[in-house]
């Protein structure tokens, strides 16, 4: 199948999933064309049958905000016409599904099919803004196929966008179990922490919804009882606020800001605990990646996280903002080697339910169904 993929190429869940899916599809013999404004973040090496098409957005004084969605529509049209795309997989409803529909209209209705994957904030945040709600709803409903990364996100879409539930196929995110495992890389502990220190990790785009400050507050309480170091991976608008809080709490010397990292698997494989204190998560891909590396996860009980993290089995769940509870759960594991080993093994075992070998064929099957209609 010739597949176009339109996505945000940046550091974030939807872009990561789109890129990893494209790589897996290419491995399985499909021809994949990424259509976006920059090379996808995790597409850092040559992969046979993968092509990248840059969306160019000319700057004109007339436009205070250059219309990327229009340039994307034309780029999709050009790639579809030149390479004979069978389908366009839009990751994130706006503007990708919108631009795909425009491209399809320009080519005439009998061309590629559109499959839109809903990832989270396109439904729970951006799409519910009055400025974008109508176009988000239109774009989803005009798609030939719709997938959501969790049952939670499917329910939200049905409730807020009047989409028939039978039109939405839930296909969860997946993880490469060969790359994400505890023994996949040489141990970097000595480069990241002092001997005897436990390594606690958080990875995000440092936006307010991720509540990175809660991760620092949890760590501050844990570090009073257990020698430990907090690794903060990623970057974003909240970083300076997080740095100031670490200084205010007196833990800045034990908090390492690593910025954006292309290969988080190496960091997760030597971590002892992963913190995900988000206010909202449609799935929690990074929690799954941590679990695959045998790292117990302490997360908030929101959105699709309970579909991945089972409280008391492969991690712990707590209410949003309950930093004391999260700290207590962290200490329970970090002070009891047997409890940690049991939860680490359970985390890896449960992550296997979300292997690429299990999930990617679900997309292939859905592609076939959609093309056959």
What positions do the PLM features span?
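Aromatic "clamp/platform" in nucleotide-sugar-dependent glycosyltransferases that forms part
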Residues: 260, 279
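A short, well-ordered alpha-helix in the C-terminal region of glycosyltransferases
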Residues: 325, 332, 339-353, 362-365
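Short hydrophobic beta-strand element within catalytic cores of glycosyltransferases
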Residues: 296-299, 309
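Carbohydrate-associated surface elements
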Residues: 152, 174
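N-terminal strand-loop element at the rim of the active site
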Residues: 7-11, 23-68
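A short helix/loop element that forms part of the nucleotide-sugar donor recognition site in Leloir-type
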Residues: 180-194
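Conserved donor-binding/catalytic core segment of Leloir-type glycosyltransferases
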Residues: 193-219
